[in-house]
UniProtKB/Swiss-Prot annotation:
Binding positions (Zn(2+)): 77-78, 81, 93
Broad class of where this protein is predominantly found: mitochondrion
Other remarks in the entry: This protein may be expected to contain an N-terminal transit peptide but none has been predicted.
Organism: Leishmania major
HAMAP family linked to this entry: Coq4 (MF_03111)
Membrane topology: Peripheral membrane protein
The family this protein is said to belong to: Belongs to the COQ4 family.
Name the UniProt record assigns to this protein: Ubiquinone biosynthesis protein COQ4 homolog, mitochondrial
Protein's UniProt keywords contain Zinc: yes
Entry cofactors: Zn(2+)
GO terms (BP aspect): ubiquinone biosynthetic process
Length: 187
């Protein structure tokens, strides 16, 4: 993950400045217009009774840069829920974990899939194929040397809070899962 961040201009900047998403970002987001990315973030966090400060600190990683990369991975998880349009059902959480695995290569996403699979009905399990396709289409990619879909750790989410949600979607190139599923139903 560190190498992917170092290979991207925005990622290098994030590693240099190491922004931390704190409770003040959530407080700021609560006052934003309903059409903004930040408002959706605040609504998600409040609905689930989450606080950015509630995440357990990264431990057992001696290298400070690698420790920050893991901190960023954890802090960006809530932003991934917002940009992908996924809630917190088991199915949606598994979709997010597949998405994260496609972006980071961390096996945690696949392990979550294995752990969550027994809790899924046959119909829900059938949806996993669609989620896999969606995550694959939203994996980091580039066109003509420029990121078409950046690795989500390289997105300056903390700078996106006041932007319109649709603008952030366009910036990231990520298709929210509900939009993907709606298009699939039409075809």
């Amino acid at each position: 993950m560190k190498n992917c961040m170092m290979a991207d201009q925005r990622g290098r900047s994030i590693l240099q400045y190491q922004p931390i998403v704190g409770d003040e970002a959530l407080e700021f987001s609560r006052g934003l217009a309903p059409s903004t990315f930040g408002f959706r973030y605040a609504a998600y966090m409040d609905r689930n009774h989450f606080l950015p400060s509630g995440r357990t600190a990264v431990k057992h990683i001696a290298d400070p840069t690698l420790a920050y990369v893991m901190t960023r991975y954890r802090q960006c998880h809530d932003f991934v829920h917002i940009i992908t349009g996924c809630g917190r059902s088991i199915e949606e959480e598994l979709a997010v974990k597949i998405f994260e695995w496609k972006h980071t290569g961390l096996p945690l996403g696949l392990l979550s899939l294995l752990g969550g699979a027994p809790r899924l009905s046959a119909a829900q399990w059938a949806h996993i194929r669609l989620y896999w396709e969606w995550a694959s289409r939203n994996a980091p990619s580039s066109r003509h040397g420029e990121p078409a879909v950046p690795m989500y750790l390289n997105v300056p989410w903390e700078d996106m809070l006041a932007k319109e949600y649709d603008e952030v979607v366009a910036y990231t190139g990520i298709t929210p899962l509900p939009d993907f599923l709606e298009k699939r139903q039409k075809h």
